[in-house]
Regions:
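C-terminal regulatory domains involved in ligand/effector binding and gene-expression control
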Residues: 1-73
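Solvent-exposed alpha-helical segments within well-ordered globular domains of core cellular machineries
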Residues: 33-40, 44, 81, 111, ...
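Short, flexible loop/turn motifs enriched in small residues
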Residues: 48-50, 85-88
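Glycine- and acidic-rich phosphate- and metal-coordinating loops
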Residues: 57, 89-99
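Conserved mixed alpha/beta catalytic, RNA-binding, or beta-rich assembly cores of soluble enzyme
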Residues: 72, 76-84, 109-113
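Conserved phosphate/anionic-ligand binding catalytic regions in large, soluble enzymes, centered on
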Residues: 101-102, 106-109
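Long, charge-dense
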Residues: 106, 113-132
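Conserved small/polar residues in nucleotide/adenosyl-binding loops
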Residues: 135-136
Length: 137
């Protein structure tokens, strides 16, 4: 038997770090198409934001992320790492940043995007799922 975890539902969280506003959105998904559609919806909704960074994991094989103009490795990858550490799959997360005028630096960006993903996951909740072998006798 192999276990995995999935988000219980959609979630939205928000916090401010040095005047930059971070809005985290999380949604359970089952296909890459659903994930890409959600990312497109968030980019359209927050068209005036400086950055709409995203990541998704589907099953054990499909994982993607995007930094949307933030320095490489400071947004999408740290968000993805949150879900990998928690063994969560079938999830898409978009974090929108409205720049507040104060540079956060690479470490500050990494911490802020990770926090936003963690907060959204905590707000959504997580369900344990199991795959059972059909070899019962």
């Amino acid at each position: 038997m192999s276990d995995f975890r999935v988000p219980c539902g959609a979630a939205e969280t928000e916090f401010t770090e040095k005047r930059s506003r971070f809005i985290g959105h999380l949604l359970p998904v089952e296909t890459e198409e659903q994930a890409r559609e959600f990312i497109a919806q968030m980019k359209k909704k927050y068209y005036d934001a400086r950055h709409n960074c995203w990541c998704y994991l589907i099953g054990s094989d499909i994982l993607r992320y995007g930094d949307d103009g933030e320095p490489q490795g400071t947004a999408g990858q740290p968000m993805l790492n949150v879900f990998r550490r928690e063994n969560v799959t079938n999830v898409v997360c978009v974090v929108t940043r409205y720049f507040g005028g104060i540079l956060l630096g690479a470490g500050g960006l990494t911490r802020a995007y990770s926090k936003s993903a963690r907060d959204a996951l905590a707000a959504a909740g997580v369900a344990e799922m199991g795959l059972r072998s059909e070899e019962r006798r």
